[in-house]
Amino acid sequence: MTSTDNDNILYEYPLQERMRTYLRLEHGFEQLKASRVCFDEQAEPFFNALFAVTELLERCDIRTELTKDLELDKQRLQKWEEHPDVDRDALQRTISEIEHCINTLQDIPKYLRQLKDDALLTSIRQRFSQPGMSGLFELPQLHLWLSQSAEEKQQQCERWSQTLALVELAITLKLTLLREQSVFAPIQLQNGFLQESSEQLLAMLRIKVPRSAKIYPVISGHRQRFTVRFMPLPGESKETSLHDIEFELARCSP
């Protein structure tokens, strides 16, 4: 996820393959929501997002990996139950949310089967998976479907989206827990390059860069070692300073 506020741009980089998958799914669900807003003007982004999310869920064993991660989160939170200063109600709500998500993840094959058995989606999916633009002359069944009223189309899109809503909920919860347990620390670099090793296993890096700096991070690494190099936007002036760079870094552990 890359987001902005008034002063900073937030970049995130996964250091584990399953975190990469989680972030891709989060992005796919965000695209699915955004495309529904302008569905009447352009339907292609919605179907592209729906098929991309579906394909990712079919290729990756999300059920096993995400269940395992949420179980670990649950165990970690349960250790706080006897702490005198903890908000027990809030803690129990979060634990209950985790348990609910773990239970619903077991039904992922059923959700995917529902989409795979949808006659319209099955008839157009292969065309959407091919490179290049598709014209409605190649998809007359979609052309007919698009001629329905806006209300009918929105209702159908809602049903398709709701099929995967519980998966989205679990992904959102996992990434929220991961992000909230990390703390940003200020860092200043003299040469625009950071290399760091960690005894603790890391899952993701989060980097806040001032908008005014007009630079972006190029990140590489794995769970115990990573590098960050800052670069100006391609095509921008080479005079962009890469010295005395100030940013904030959060190291997220699984």
UniProtKB/Swiss-Prot annotation:
The keyword Transport does not apply. InterPro entries: ZapD, ZapD_C, ZapD_sf. GO terms for cellular component: cell division site; cytoplasm. The keyword Lyase does not apply. Pfam families: ZapD. Keywords: Cell cycle, Cell division, Cytoplasm, Septation. It is found in: Cytoplasm. One of its GO terms (biological process) is division septum assembly. Cell division factor that enhances FtsZ-ring assembly. Directly interacts with FtsZ and promotes bundling of FtsZ protofilaments, with a reduction in FtsZ GTPase activity. Belongs to the ZapD family. HAMAP family: ZapD (MF_01092). Interacts with FtsZ. PANTHER family: CELL DIVISION PROTEIN ZAPD. This is Cell division protein ZapD. It comes from Idiomarina loihiensis (strain ATCC BAA-735 / DSM 15497 / L2-TR).
